[in-house]
Amino acid sequence: NGWISYKKSKLCNILFTKKLSELALKNNITVNCLHPGFVKTGFGKNNTGVIGLIIKSLMSLFAIRVEEGAETIIYLATSNNVKNISGEYFYESKVNKPSNFAENNKSADNLWDLSIKILKNKGLTL
């Protein structure tokens, strides 16, 4: 299912960020992740029928402009307010609590270990 895969990929982004932040802080590097919001994009454009109609309707009613979706990205890249914040999940330029699944340090460690293993299998090292 595409939606389940999409949600899992977002969970992995948060878990990976937490672990990367833990390691990067040793070198005074901060790492955060974010949710840009429900942005008007081509997401779901290949859906047809009732699902396609629902997605198009929701997009036209609730989605924000791309420029608005970029605000948190720009904020994290440029603001002094977040220069000492790392390993967090941001939404609307504020730290936001992710799902309980995203708070699981063991899952973050497992994802990191799997990522390293995949890289090694491809002949890459970190």
Task: Describe these PLM feature segments.
Residues 2, 101, 105-126:
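Non-catalytic terminal and boundary segments that flank Rossmann-like NAD(P)-dependent oxidoreductase
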Residues 17-21, 74, 112, 116:
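Non-transmembrane alpha-helical segments in soluble domains
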Residues 39, 98-99:
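Glycine-rich, flexible loop/turn motifs
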Residues 1-29, 35-57:
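Catalytic loop of short-chain dehydrogenase/reductase
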Residues 6-13, 52, 66-73, 123-126:
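Low-complexity, flexible helical/coil segments
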Residues 9, 33, 57-97, 103-109, ...:
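C-terminal helical subdomain
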Residues 24-29, 83-84, 120-126:
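Surface-exposed helix-capping loop/turn segments at secondary-structure junctions
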